[in-house]
Regions:
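Leucine-rich solenoid repeat scaffolds
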Residues: 62-112
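Short, solvent-exposed linear patches
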Residues: 19, 60-62
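Feature marks extracellular polysaccharide-active and adherence modules
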Residues: 4-5, 9, 15, 25-26, ...
Length: 112
């Protein structure tokens, strides 16, 4: 899945799937975002503005540097649960997520 430089109304929901890599970068998403059960090699969720809560759960990636989840502005809560590896900055050079609500579970880690 590649989603770049888009304006999305109604939210983004990705359930399952796999592939070499997936990126959701530089988007404006109205309605929240969910990525649940993805099992590819690498996943990046970077520099998005999300109007609504975001759920990032049950994703298992092959690369130890996968699950880069940084530099997002989230107007809602950020839930991260049961991801392998846990969401992190990685080598993206990104900054912590700006979340107006709560950062829960794995996304409550310092630097995210």
């Amino acid at each position: 899945m590649q989603l770049h430089f888009a304006h999305v109304n109604g939210g983004v929901r990705i359930f399952g799937g796999n592939g070499f890599f997936s990126t959701v970068e530089d988007n404006v998403i109205n309605g929240g975002a969910t990525i649940d059960g993805y099992s590819g090699f690498w996943l990046g969720f970077i520099r998005n503005t999300i109007h609504g809560s975001t759920n990032f759960s049950n994703n298992t990636l092959g690369d130890p540097d996968a699950n880069e989840f940084v530099t997002n502005t989230i107007r809602g809560n950020l839930f991260c649960h049961n991801n392998v590896p846990a969401p992190h900055v990685g080598d993206s050079g990104g900054s912590p997520n700006n979340v107006s609500g709560r950062k829960v579970d794995q996304c409550a880690a310092p630097g995210l």
